[in-house]
Every structure is written in C-alpha cells, then in structure tokens.
C-alpha cells in the first residue's frame, strides 16, 4: 500500500502479533495550496490481519490536550478494540474520542482491515 499525507494526523497501524502504532508518514502541504506540490509517499506491506486507521484532526483534537497524547490514546483504543465488526469498532473509536462533546472541526474516520487473499 502507498500512503501520502496532506498534514493529517498519522495513520495508526495494527498488526496481529506486532502491536499497534502510528505510522511515520512525512506530511505534504495542505491540499489546494500548491497545484504543483509533491507529496512524499510511504510504502507499507499488506499482511493478513493488517488494520489501518486514518482520521482527521477533528476526531482527536481537544482544546488544552496535547495532540501527541490524543494520538496515543486513539492508538491504545485501537489496540484494545474488537475487530470482528468494523461498524462497532468505528463506533467504539468515535465514542472513545469524546462523541459526547461539541466538535469544532470536521470529523472523518477510515478503517481498512486487510483479511488477505481469498
């Protein structure tokens, strides 16, 4: 898989037996600023059980809370989440990041779970 970033929080990778961690994806410029911009790419091998979570900062940013702490918290929630039902997993992650609070920014969450070839 090839990934690029336009300044969003790092995607979080979960691998069976290897743990859960944010991926280092060098950020490019915000989309729309420079039509000729180059975006650095990061390649990640897909293995059965691989899970990748991508989100906008609106999901995890909270005034007065360090962004690195928020990323670490989301990483911990993903590490503990049951992956048998992605809808329920997404609901769990959204709830864990403060679904009850007023959001001040857009929220987007994408979860990819690669089961392997059939």
Label each residue range with its predicted role:
Residues 1-118:
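Conserved subregion of the PPM/PP2C metallophosphatase catalytic domain
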